[in-house]
A protein has these predicted regions:
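Conserved active-site tyrosine of GNAT-family acetyltransferases
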Residues: 23, 117, 122
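Conserved beta-strand in the GNAT
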Residues: 50, 56-64, 71-76
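Conserved acetyl-CoA-binding loop-helix of GNAT-fold acetyltransferases
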Residues: 77, 83-96
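Conserved catalytic-core motifs of GNAT/GCN5-like acyltransferases
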Residues: 123-138
């Protein structure tokens, strides 16, 4: 049984700790992202999500408003729970929540995640770039009628 909750870090510190644990495992430990880059000044302004699988937090994400629209960020699923469709469930929930805001929806995708986001209506924009020593493309959600 899957459950997805949304929260603010400053309102639900117990959920913030669970989200940070997933991000630590995926980004800092697996991908060697510098913790100073992983945890930033936007933690308390972003809306965060946790996906629970049988009451265990296994995936997280966040979104925030920027000058360029709504930026989806920090999508991470624990290694043990990948390729089970959980990322798609989480992405769909986030998109359901932000789509009514009528703003551009975009993200910075690691190269290996591009096919996942393309399956969900995102397209690559511009040139490849490095963020936290990992190659990325900016991607934008195309309007779906």
């Amino acid at each position: 049984v899957n459950e997805i909750i949304s929260f603010r870090f400053d309102e639900r510190p117990e959920f913030a700790a669970k989200a940070n644990h997933i991000r630590q495992s995926v980004f800092v430990e697996e991908q060697n992202v510098d913790p100073a880059l992983e945890y930033d000044e936007y933690e308390n302004v972003a809306t965060h999500y946790l996906l629970f699988d049988d009451n265990k937090p296994v995936a997280t994400a966040r979104w925030r408003e920027t000058a360029n629209g709504i930026k989806l960020e920090r999508f991470a699923t624990l290694f043990s729970h990948r390729n089970k469709g959980l990322g798609a469930l989480l992405l769909q929930r986030v998109l359901d929540d932000v789509s009514a805001r009528s703003k551009r929806i975009y993200l910075h995708s690691q190269l290996k995640a591009i096919p996942f986001y393309e399956r969900h209506g995102f397209v690559k924009l511009g040139e490849q770039f490095s963020e936290a020593d990992i190659e990325h493309f900016e991607m934008q959600l195309m309007n779906r009628e």
